[in-house]
């Protein structure tokens, strides 16, 4: 198996409200693959016995057969936004996640994904209209996202 390394114009920065996040160093066109993150897999049993009780639970993706996947690299650094500018696609067979821009990204703009509706923190936009992705499906309905 080979996973390509993406060299995107991105950096990790501290933010005022969200901790660290991923930011663009230059404009990035829409539909650009900005990251391919290998995934560390947790079996269903391992997750149920240990993983769900740790901070790792906040960073894992639902995978096939009850497994949970922890994205490595930038995949674990994208913050949440109810109106994301990045979407992700899982490769179940090869255990990686690809991240793509939904629209053109401006220089110094933070790149964010949607964590869905089951948040473990207070979302500053909680009163805003909600995106309701199927958390089991990495190709959440893009038509529900306003650009």
From Swiss-Prot:
Would you name any one GO CC term? cytosol
Q: Which Pfam families match?
A: SET (PF00856)
Keyword Cytoplasm (UniProt): yes
Which keywords, in A-to-Z order, does the entry hold? Answer: Cytoplasm, Methyltransferase, Nucleus, S-adenosyl-L-methionine, Sporulation, Transferase
Domain SET, by residue range, is: 8-116
Catalysed reactions, as listed in the record: L-lysyl(37)-[histone H3] + S-adenosyl-L-methionine = N(6)-methyl-L-lysyl(37)-[histone H3] + S-adenosyl-L-homocysteine + H(+); N(6)-methyl-L-lysyl(37)-[histone H3] + S-adenosyl-L-methionine = N(6),N(6)-dimethyl-L-lysyl(37)-[histone H3] + S-adenosyl-L-homocysteine + H(+); N(6),N(6)-dimethyl-L-lysyl(37)-[histone H3] + S-adenosyl-L-methionine = N(6),N(6),N(6)-trimethyl-L-lysyl(37)-[histone H3] + S-adenosyl-L-homocysteine + H(+)
Q: What happens when the gene is disrupted?
A: Abnormal sporulation resulting in asci with fewer than four spores and with abnormal spore wall morphology.
**Result when mutating residue 79 to A:** Abolishes activity
Q: Which GO terms describe its biological process?
A: chromatin organization; methylation; sporulation resulting in formation of a cellular spore
Look up the EC number in the record and give it: 2.1.1.-
* Record Gene3D superfamilies: SET domain
Recorded GO MF terms: histone H3K37 methyltransferase activity
Q: Where in the cell is it found?
A: Cytoplasm; Nucleus
CDD domains attached here?
SET_SpSet7-like (cd10540)
Subunit structure, as described in the record:
Homodimer.
Quote the function comment for this protein.
Histone lysine methyltransferase that specifically mono-, di-, and trimethylates 'Lys-37' of histone H3 to regulate sporulation.
Regarding protein family, the annotation reads: Belongs to the class V-like SAM-binding methyltransferase superfamily.
Name the UniProt record assigns to this protein: Histone-lysine N-methyltransferase, H3 lysine-37 specific
* Source organism: Schizosaccharomyces pombe (strain 972 / ATCC 24843) (Fission yeast)
């Amino acid at each position: 198996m080979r996973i390509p390394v993406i060299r995107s114009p991105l950096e990790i920065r501290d933010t005022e409200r969200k901790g660290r996040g991923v930011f663009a160093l230059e404009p990035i066109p829409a539909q650009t693959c900005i990251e391919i993150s290998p995934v560390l897999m947790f079996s269903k049993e391992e997750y149920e016995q240990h993983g769900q009780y740790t901070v790792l639970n906040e960073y894992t993706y639902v995978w096939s057969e009850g497994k949970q996947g922890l994205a490595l690299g930038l995949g674990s650094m994208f913050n949440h936004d109810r109106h994301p500018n990045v979407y992700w696609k899982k490769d179940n067979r090869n255990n990686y996640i690809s991240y793509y821009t939904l629209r053109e990204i401006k220089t110094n703009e933070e790149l964010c994904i949607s964590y869905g509706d089951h948040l473990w923190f207070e979302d500053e936009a909680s009163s805003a209209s909600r995106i309701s992705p199927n958390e089991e499906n990495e190709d959440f309905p893009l038509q529900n996202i306003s650009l």
